[in-house]
Amino acid sequence: MVALTLALAAATSSAEVLHVRVVDSNQDPVPQVAIYVEQSGTSRAARAPASAVMDQRYKRFVPHILVVQKGAQVSFPNSDVVAHHVYSFSRPNNFVLPLYKGTPPDPVRFDHDGVVTLGCNIHDSMLGYIVVVDSDIFAISNEDGVARLDVDSDAAQWTVHAWSPRFRNTREPLVRTIMAGEALTVTFALEKKLRPSHDDHTESVLWNDYD
C-alpha cells in the first residue's frame, strides 16, 4: 500500500525548471555558489540522500564546495601522494579523519543541515566546504553564475537559498521565495563586495567564522 501511494504521488507531480542567477555588485556573474530549494505543498516524497565524494588533489579539496542532502554519506579519498589529516570543527557536524593516504574505509555521515568547513591539519592552505541541506533539490552556479534546478510543478511555494564563502555574511544564506503562479526565475544581485576567491589564497580568514 505504501509503495502504491508513493507511485501515485510521483505520477501526479511533474518537474519544471527553476532558473537562478547570481551576480555581484558590478553585475558580473558569480560562479561556485551553492543553490538549494525547499518547496511546500508538493505531492512528491523526498528522494533518499545520495552518497557523495570530497576528494583531495594537489593539496586542495575537490570540489571546493559540495552540496549534499541531510543524511548523506560523504567519502574523503586522498588522491595526493602526501598524507592528509582532514577535520572540521563545524558543530554538530564536526569530525576528524586522522593522518591517512588512500581512502578511509568508512564515509562520514552528515545528519544536520548547515555549512561544514573543512581543513587539513598538515596543510593549512587547504580549505573546503560541505553545505548540508534539508532538501533533495540543489546545484552549484556555473561560470555564468547560473543554476538550473528541477522543481515540482504542483508545489505551492519554493524557497530558494544561495550561499558562498565569498559572501560577506556567511552565517546565513540569501533567501528568495516564489509563490505558485509566479515565474520560476530568481536573481540574487549582491550589493556588498565579495570576499576574494580561494584561488587568491586569502580565504583562510573564514576559519574565524567557526562557532
Which sequence ranges carry the predicted segments?
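Short, surface-exposed beta-strand/beta-hairpin micro-motifs centered on an aromatic residue
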Residues: F95, P105-P107, D144-V151
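A short, solvent-exposed loop/turn motif at the edges and junctions
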Residues: F61, V81-V96, H123-M126, A162-P173
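A short, Gly/Thr-enriched small/hydrophobic beta-strand-prone motif that recurs across taxa
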Residues: T12-S25, L194-D199
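Structured interaction patches on ligand/partner-binding surfaces of diverse proteins
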Residues: K101, V133-S141, R166-T185
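A short, solvent-exposed beta-strand micro-motif common in secreted/extracellular proteins
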Residues: I35, Q73-N78, L118, A155-R166
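Short, ordered, surface-exposed loop/turn motifs in non-cytosolic proteins
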Residues: N26-R44, V81, D124-M126, D154-A156
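A short, amphipathic beta-strand motif
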Residues: L18-D24, I35, F76, G145-A147
